[in-house]
Regions:
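Eukaryotic low-complexity, intrinsically disordered regulatory segments enriched in serine, proline
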Residues: 22, 26, 52-60, 208, ...
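N-terminal non-cleavable signal-anchor helices
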Residues: 3, 45-48, 310
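C-terminal motif of bacterial Sec signal peptides marking the signal peptidase cleavage site
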Residues: 17-20
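N-terminal Sec/ER secretory leader and immediately downstream segment
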Residues: 25-175
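Hydrophilic extracytoplasmic domains
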Residues: 275-329
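Extended amphipathic alpha-helical interaction segments
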Residues: 139-285
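Bacterial N-terminal signal peptides that target proteins for export
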Residues: 2-11
Length: 329
């Protein structure tokens, strides 16, 4: 019985391991075929391929969040501001379900609270309050106004959907995956709108729309897939470049056309995605945690020469230049 269980466990583990390799093999197939084409054209052996590096670990939760002090006040003090229509909102936030609400719902609560406080402060209600309650309203409104950008940042960076997008347990993006990218871009665009309009009293957020977009982001770790696609392409291009460089002194062979259309489509999707991610991060009116700044510069940047995008562009440009030394078959 014990032996059977061990065999079953080993069998299941083998399935998991094989399953984990499948996506990478799929992304690598066009490169294997292209390397073989180059080797045949140049009458050499197979190009030796190495495993590309994985992306770096996403910053730990504590390192990527901004501390927001909890606002505490008595029920009586909140009730004194009942004309601002915040009592039921605060009560819902303080009940058991409200305290364990996901970051997205906390974001909606804080923004709605700010809207009501801001509207109240800019109405004739403060004139009807006692001096003490008017000061209390002014202080609470100022506090929530100052905290809202950090709350918005935390709502995104504390969400499991956002963290999942950067998962190292992922595979490179493939041609077949491109159909999912537009829907993910729509999700990022909605988060962008929420961020840009967080201080717009007229703009109304929608809970179901927000949750729907977050669900989309959770369906696949697209940021990680994009980065790993770039790392794979960079690795394979540099391997091909090494071969072409060795043969370029006496280019006695011709090269067949390189069908790079699928790579161009993947690169365009990667550029669109990284632009959207960087724009969302940079739009936040906060001082970004240093761990997030480092991760963004190292992995997400479109300008850092050491980041995956620039490395891929450099390798691709070198490859096109090296191919130009050879006649086309």
């Amino acid at each position: 019985m014990v032996r059977w269980k061990r065999r079953k466990a080993a069998f299941l583990l083998s399935i998991i391991l094989l399953g984990g390799c499948g996506g990478n093999d799929l992304a690598d197939q066009p490169w294997v075929a292209y390397h073989q084409q180059l080797a045949n054209d140049l009458s050499v052996g197979n190009i030796e391929q190495a495993e590309p590096e994985n992306i770096g670990a996403f910053p730990e939760r504590k390192a990527r969040l901004i501390e927001v002090p909890e606002t505490r006040d008595s029920i009586l003090n909140v009730y004194a501001l009942r004309e601002c229509q915040i009592t039921s909102l605060v009560a819902a936030r303080n009940n058991q379900l409200g305290r364990v609400a996901p970051p997205s719902q906390q974001w909606l609560y804080e923004r709605k609270l700010w809207q009501r406080l801001n509207s109240c402060w800019n109405s004739n209600i403060p004139e009807q309050l006692s001096d003490e309650n008017r000061d209390r309203l002014e202080h609470l409104t100022a506090t929530k106004t100052a905290q809202l950008p950090a709350v918005s940042w935390n709502a995104i960076f504390d969400s499991s959907e956002w963290e999942q997008s950067f998962s190292r347990a992922s595979q490179p993006l493939t041609q077949a995956d491109l159909m999912d990218v537009p829907q993910h871009l729509e999700a990022i665009d909605y988060l962008q709108q929420m961020t840009e309009h967080q201080f717009d009293p007229e703009w109304q957020q929608d809970s179901s729309t927000l949750e729907s977009h977050l669900k989309t982001l959770q369906e696949r770790p697209l940021t990680a897939e994009v980065l790993r696609m770039l790392l794979l392409a960079n690795q394979r291009l540099r391997e091909a470049n090494n071969l072409l460089r060795q043969q370029s002194d006496e280019p006695s062979h011709c090269l067949r056309q390189w069908d790079a259309a699928s790579l161009e489509r993947l690169a365009e999707a990667a550029n669109q995605w990284l632009m959207a991610i960087n724009r969302l991060i940079d739009t936040q009116p906060v001082e970004k945690p240093s761990a997030v700044q480092r991760y963004q510069t190292r992995w997400l940047s479109l300008h850092n020469p050491q980041a995956p995008w620039a490395q891929f562009q450099q390798a691709k440009s070198q490859h096109e230049s090296l191919r130009a030394h050879f006649d086309t078959c």
